[in-house]
């Protein structure tokens, strides 16, 4: 009889999703090894160039995923985060308008630094998890279940001597690393996904939007409490239809700003003078707070990023490979669900492994196909597919809402309708999450806003949130048609009142 051994999983990518996956499977009793191309983020001297500066918005789905692995991690992250209770819309005339995310329940999303989130998650991994940084996946031999890597190695290892790029050499991993399961958590340009597509028929699509993003920053100002020159408990938006600027608060009183602008418009801002005129015309309040020089210096030196939607189906192959996070479903950032969805992938996978009674040990030879694990991974891919398609669609929809629709009277009217109907026809309380069932609320009853379902209801799948919103939108449209037939006068008075408020605000 074959001897029992722990299952061996190789996780490629030590970002937030990869680190949580490693901790989750370690807690389940698997033998875990993690490869990461970048430097170890745990050291204080971690290279800033290896730490993406963009802030992350973590909400209920992400927090619930963290709690499912270790409740203390979620609470520790909340201490590092800044709650944001709504959007603060900055109009061109300088007026500001608060739009609460949850006007009835008062729930918030949370701004947290990506480097801090990543460092804390990697720091939470025990010594039993084998971490290999500066390790780049070269190729995977799926026939023999072996992965090969190249490594950056230091030629000088004297104590206290700083590492330099020119002291690093790439060396090939000649022996390779055998595995039972390889998990690709290596982002939008996943090498694990590329290897899987060579081994199996996988549908893959990618679509770029015409906008670039550029990271800017608003320094802390000691003249204000805590250094915050703007309300720290809002996500700040300067919507300008074709483009927009957003700002998320940091713990030190600064704000991380991101400009989203069409490449075609960006090409016209080819001089410092033209860029200065652009910011003064469209974002005068931001220029006043940040300072023109700081804003323009950031604009000139910081890279232009692409925004892409990626879908991959199926996301699993046999019992040997699966994709999580951006490797499977990269999305544009306008719903703030990229991180939350990726972390939720980990919770859903763990739930399905539990449901299929996948033991952390096996008597199969290392790399041998496991029919039971294959069924579990297929179940994950099949069940998750609809939700991933839905959130990618919703993120694209919110791309238009944030830069344009938030300025529309119809947007304000719909928010008021949601508030009234939510009060009159309250949805059932959030169902308790189960280890065996990731989304216990199969059908949302009553009335609740799309934003609440997506952001604050981890018991509801994204596809159900989209289905419910389509139904509610039809109800609002039908009610509006009936109102137009039987209550033209009343509707006219209401419309005039809304228009008056709109004009006063503008």
From Swiss-Prot:
Chain positions covered by the region annotation Disordered: 153-174
A cellular component term, taken from the record's GO annotations: peroxisome
Documented EC number(s): 1.14.13.9
GO molecular function annotation: FAD binding; kynurenine 3-monooxygenase activity; NAD(P)H oxidase H2O2-forming activity
Keywords: FAD, Flavoprotein, Membrane, Mitochondrion, Mitochondrion outer membrane, Monooxygenase, NADP, Oxidoreductase, Pyridine nucleotide biosynthesis
Gene Ontology biological process: 'de novo' NAD biosynthetic process from L-tryptophan; anthranilate metabolic process; kynurenine metabolic process; L-tryptophan catabolic process; quinolinate biosynthetic process
Associated pathway: Cofactor biosynthesis; NAD(+) biosynthesis; quinolinate from L-kynurenine: step 1/3
Gene3D superfamilies found in the cross-reference section: FAD/NAD(P)-binding domain (3.50.50.60)
Needed cofactors: FAD
Location relative to the cell: Mitochondrion outer membrane
Class of enzymatic activity (EC top level): oxidoreductase
Biased composition, class Basic and acidic residues, residue ranges: 162-171
Pfam families attached to this UniProt entry: FAD_binding_3
Catalysed transformations (reactions): L-kynurenine + NADPH + O2 + H(+) = 3-hydroxy-L-kynurenine + NADP(+) + H2O
Family: Belongs to the aromatic-ring hydroxylase family. KMO subfamily.
Function: Catalyzes the hydroxylation of L-kynurenine (L-Kyn) to form 3-hydroxy-L-kynurenine (L-3OHKyn). Required for synthesis of quinolinic acid.
Descriptive protein name: Kynurenine 3-monooxygenase
Source organism: Cryptococcus neoformans var. neoformans serotype D (strain JEC21 / ATCC MYA-565) (Filobasidiella neoformans)
């Amino acid at each position: 009889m074959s001897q029992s051994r722990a299952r061996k999983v190789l996780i490629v990518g030590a970002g937030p999703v990869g680190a949580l996956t490693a901790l989750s499977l370690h807690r389940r009793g698997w033998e875990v090894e993690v490869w990461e191309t970048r430097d170890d983020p745990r050291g204080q001297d971690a290279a800033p160039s290896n730490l993406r500066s963009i802030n992350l918005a973590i909400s209920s789905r992400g927090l619930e995923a963290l709690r499912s692995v270790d409740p203390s991690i979620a609470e520790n992250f909340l201490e590092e985060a800044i709650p944001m209770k709504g959007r603060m819309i900055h109009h061109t005339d300088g007026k500001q308008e608060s739009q609460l995310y949850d006007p009835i329940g008062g729930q918030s999303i949370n701004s947290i630094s990506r480097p801090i989130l990543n460092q804390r998650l990697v720091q939470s991994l025990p010594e039993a998890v084998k971490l290999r940084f500066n390790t780049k996946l070269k190729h995977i031999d799926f026939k023999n279940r072996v992965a090969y890597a190249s490594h950056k190695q230091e030629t000088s290892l004297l104590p206290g001597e700083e590492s330099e790029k020119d002291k690093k050499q790439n060396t090939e991993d000649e022996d390779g690393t055998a595995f039972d399961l390889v998990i690709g958590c290596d982002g939008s340009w996943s090498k694990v996904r590329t290897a899987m597509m060579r081994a199996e028929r996988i549908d893959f699509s990618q679509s770029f939007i015409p906008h670039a993003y550029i990271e800017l920053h608003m320094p802390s100002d000691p003249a204000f409490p805590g250094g915050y020159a703007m309300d720290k408990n809002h996500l700040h938006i300067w919507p300008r239809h074709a483009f927009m600027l957003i700002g998320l608060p940091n713990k030190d009183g600064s704000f991380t700003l991101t400009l989203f602008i069409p490449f075609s418009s960006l090409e016209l801002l080819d001089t410092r003078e033209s860029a200065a005129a652009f910011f003064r015309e469209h974002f005068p309040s931001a220029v006043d707070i940040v300072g023109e020089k700081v804003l323009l210096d950031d604009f000139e030196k910081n890279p232009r990023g692409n925004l892409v939607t990626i879908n991959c189906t199926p996301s699993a192959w046999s019992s040997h490979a699966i994709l999580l996070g951006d490797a499977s479903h990269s999305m544009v950032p306008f719903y703030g669900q990229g991180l939350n969805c990726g972390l939720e992938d980990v919770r859903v996978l763990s739930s399905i492994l539990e449901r299929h009674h996948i033991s952390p040990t096996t008597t199969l030879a290392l790399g041998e196909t496991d029919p039971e694990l294959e069924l579990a991974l297929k179940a994950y891919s099949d069940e998750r597919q609809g939700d991933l398609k839905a959130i990618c669609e919703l993120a694209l929809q919110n791309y238009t809402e944030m830069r344009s629709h938030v300025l529309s009277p119809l947007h304000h009217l719909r928010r008021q309708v949601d508030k009234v109907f939510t009060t009159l026809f309250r949805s059932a309380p959030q169902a308790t999450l189960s280890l065996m069932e990731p989304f216990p609320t199969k059908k949302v009853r009553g009335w609740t806003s799309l934003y609440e379902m997506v952001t604050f209801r981890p018991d509801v799948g994204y596809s159900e949130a989209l289905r419910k919103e389509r139904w509610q939108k039809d109800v609002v449209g039908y009610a509006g048609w009936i109102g137009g037939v039987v209550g033209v006068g009343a509707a006219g008075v209401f419309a005039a009142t809304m228009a008056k408020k709109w004009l006063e605000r503008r």
